[in-house]
């Protein structure tokens, strides 16, 4: 469903690592969500920092325009709201071991607009406190 729609929409290159979906625990998502302070979305976990996240260093991208296609992707009201490198592995391992897991991220940069927060540390501290309060 989501996975196949994402692969089709993004015109995923068969030679690239195949995307897969790891679901967060719905109960944790509900506990962490607050309409005023958070956004529900999809965290995309990339296999690398540069090319896999659409950053050009010295080599051309294997999938030019991938970030535009990811940005335009929608599935049953969900969209990709974050790009990082760890969540799928951690959540997948938790699921395999019978633990509950969810991801809550601080968005510190907007690649599309080229904006980034210079001082995100105070916001990270607020997010940590917010998360601990929601889970306790």
Which residues make up each language-model segment?
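Glycine-rich phosphate- or other oxyanion-binding loops that anchor nucleotides, phosphorylated ligands
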Residues: 1-136
């Amino acid at each position: 469903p989501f996975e196949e729609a994402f692969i089709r929409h993004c015109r995923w290159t068969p030679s690239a690592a195949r995307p897969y979906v790891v679901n967060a625990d719905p109960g944790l998502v509900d506990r962490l969500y607050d309409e005023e302070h958070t956004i529900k979305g999809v965290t995309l976990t990339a296999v690398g920092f540069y090319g896999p996240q659409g950053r050009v260093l010295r080599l051309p991208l294997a999938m030019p325009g991938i970030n535009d296609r990811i940005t335009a992707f929608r599935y049953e009201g969900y969209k990709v709201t974050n790009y990082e490198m760890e969540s799928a592995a951690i959540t997948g391992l938790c699921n395999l071991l019978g633990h509950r897991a969810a991801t809550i991220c601080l968005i510190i940069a907007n690649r599309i607009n080229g904006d980034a927060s210079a001082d995100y540390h105070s916001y990270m501290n607020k997010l940590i406190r917010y998360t601990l309060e929601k889970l306790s």
